[in-house]
Amino acid sequence: MTPISVTQLNNQIKSIVESHFEIVLVEGEISKVVYHSSGHLYFTLKDENSSINCAMWKSNLTRMKFRLKEGEKVYVYGALSVYVPRGEYKIIAQSIEPSGVGALQKAFEQLKEELSKLGYFDEARKKSIPRFPRRIAIVTSATGAALQDMLRVAGKRWQLTEIYLFNALVQGDGAAEDIAMKIKLADEFVFEDGSGFDLIIIGRGGGSKEDLWPFNERVVADAVYNASTPIISAVGHEIDYLISDFVADVRAATPSNAMEIALPDKNEILLMLDEMKNAFVYKISHLIQKKERELIHIRELLNASSPVKKLDMKLQECELLLKRFNHSYINQIQKKEKELNELKNILFSLSPVIKINSFEKEIELLKSTFKNKTAQIISSKEKELINLKSAYETLNPKKREKKGFAEITKNGKRIDLKELKIGDIFDVSNADVLIKSKALEKIEN
């Protein structure tokens, strides 16, 4: 037998192994996982008795939906490859699937766990949805049924909100990146008045897990998390839960439900406004009635104690006295005239001319005296009435101030000069000016 070199032997082994094991599907447990900076993946696949080194090149690794972890059981699909310089062989993996669970589900669970630890799902960071949004941005496909469903609901509930579409791919290659870009664009959009969108809705209609997968991608989760605008996630049907649902501020069961959450119902608002109006009218009416009763009470108190009221009462008393006076003297005059007539009759019956003349003079004197006395009394009462009116004018603070008088108050109350003490702070005011004063010296007259 002719001897061969080590390299020759390894090359022969390589030729035999790689030609006979072009495709292998191996089940085992993951260990020694290394994600290299070059983008390649290196790991060991083992069972109870053996192990084999494995590698997955960057070109295939980019298609994996989940990351390998120590201790996981997987199916590795690939081919055997021999490294001639060291005589080592390994599996060059083309794809890796979790054992017992689908790759997509595994990727979903891994990303969900990772984002949860990072605080992406914390309720404390989530923003509230505005009750009356002025502008809403919808990130979805322009040709999808989800958009039409949302517009139909919006037309029924509330027509005052402006709705803008950011057309995006919602499935297939590049969809996740396109959705993330449109979320960022809507979040940073600024109108001419300086304001942005009040709310963003992302979503699409139902579909398979693969169809909905873009909303499970990390790039979409990051875009939702970093947005300053409140976001509603409305993907698929009620039974579908996506990563975007957990990160968004609010999760809607369907796109139609998202619009029901986002917009108020005009009929409910009208009913609420009607109830508020009725309650307001009732309260105002009740308040007006209460204030009217208080006003009447205050007027009664003012009328009972006002100088005008007192003056009116004095005037009425004077008028009553004048009436009584006039009535009394008229009666006396009538009585004297009656007596005079009687005397005249007696005198005429006796025909003593001298006595008649004497009585006539006496009567004339009585008349003159009566008239003078009456005039004096009337004049006296008129003067008394004038004095009462003058006293009223004097008591009126505004009249006094216009005549040069000033009012002295302390702590908002009128006070006599005699009541002031040295050091007291008081106000001196008339109709035009108020002077803050302090008593420095007190001299009694």
Swiss-Prot record:
**Which top-rank group of organisms is this from?**
Bacteria
- Please give the catalytic activity noted in the UniProt record: Exonucleolytic cleavage in either 5'- to 3'- or 3'- to 5'-direction to yield nucleoside 5'-phosphates
- Write the record's keywords in alphabetical order, separated by commas: Cytoplasm, Exonuclease, Hydrolase, Nuclease
Its EC number(s) = 3.1.11.6
Cellular component terms, GO, for this chain's entry? Answer: cytoplasm; exodeoxyribonuclease VII complex
- Places the protein is found: Cytoplasm
- Tell me which Gene Ontology terms the entry assigns under biological process: DNA catabolic process
Cite the GO molecular-function annotations of the record. exodeoxyribonuclease VII activity; nucleic acid binding
- Decide whether keyword Transferase is in the record: no
Broad class of the protein's primary localization: cytoplasm
Q: What PANTHER family does this protein map onto?
A: EXODEOXYRIBONUCLEASE 7 LARGE SUBUNIT
Q: Which HAMAP family match?
A: Exonuc_7_L
> What the protein does?
Bidirectionally degrades single-stranded DNA into large acid-insoluble oligonucleotides, which are then degraded further into small acid-soluble oligonucleotides.
Q: Give the multimer and partner information.
A: Heterooligomer composed of large and small subunits.
Q: What is this protein called?
A: Exodeoxyribonuclease 7 large subunit
**Gene (UniProt):** xseA
